[in-house]
Amino acid sequence: MRHGIAGRKLGVTSSHRQAMFRNMAVALIKHEQITTTLPKAKELRPVAEKLITLGKRGGLHARRQAYAQLRDEVIVTKLFSAIAERYKARQGGYTRVLKAGVRYGDAASMAVIELVDRDVSAKGQDSGPRPERDETEE
């Protein structure tokens, strides 16, 4: 029996789940709105809320905790500057999950998870690979 066990396994291993939520959290902070399956969106919500709370707290320790979770310095900078400033007066409830019908291929229930009061211009930002920094340049 699985009484009192919180969270969904989503059919993947724990390391896969951790990496998936890291990638989804980075995408959510970068684009401020993403489309995914409904169970993944519902599981991503507390992860994103805790990261935004870290951004609001500020300070070096909170920044290191956020970097340990996200592993992307540009996204951590956006989290601690723009997003933290936007939600400084809001006590939680930074994200919303909207149902978005079903996926054509397998009829999976889809959802849009977005930041409340989001920046609409952030939606289509380039998500391609970043150019590698050349270590020989000085």
From Swiss-Prot:
GO terms for cellular component: cytosolic large ribosomal subunit. It holds the Pfam family Ribosomal_L17. GO terms for biological process: translation. One of its GO terms (molecular function) is structural constituent of ribosome. SUPFAM superfamilies: Prokaryotic ribosomal protein L17. PROSITE patterns: RIBOSOMAL_L17. It comes from the Bacteria. Keywords: Ribonucleoprotein, Ribosomal protein. Part of the 50S ribosomal subunit. Contacts protein L32. Belongs to the bacterial ribosomal protein bL17 family. This is Large ribosomal subunit protein bL17. The lineage of its organism: Bacteria, Pseudomonadati, Pseudomonadota, Alphaproteobacteria, Acetobacterales. The gene is rplQ.
